[in-house]
């Protein structure tokens, strides 16, 4: 998957999980501030991303993912070819 496809998938998952319009899920959007996710939302979102992209995101790494762009960066860097 290229970066654009990963962004699109993360936008779809985030919009679905948080019940927001996909147009609000911009790369610079903060999960907590802009998209109003709480801690449980974030845990569930990370689990969905792990499943969607077939990867494990350790808790200490998940805590560093605060924006949509950071989620995209993480997936791009850690996806298996």
Curated annotation (Swiss-Prot):
Any one GO MF annotation of this record: acyl binding
PTM comment: 4'-phosphopantetheine is transferred from CoA to a specific serine of apo-ACP by AcpS. This modification is essential for activity because fatty acids are bound in thioester linkage to the sulfhydryl of the prosthetic group.
UniProtKB keywords: Cytoplasm, Fatty acid biosynthesis, Fatty acid metabolism, Lipid biosynthesis, Lipid metabolism, Phosphopantetheine, Phosphoprotein
Modified residues (O-(pantetheine 4'-phosphoryl)serine): 39
Coiled-coil zones: none
Family classification: Belongs to the acyl carrier protein (ACP) family.
Task of the protein: Carrier of the growing fatty acid chain in fatty acid biosynthesis.
Name of the protein in its database record: Acyl carrier protein
Organism listed in the record: Rubrobacter xylanophilus (strain DSM 9941 / JCM 11954 / NBRC 16129 / PRD-1)
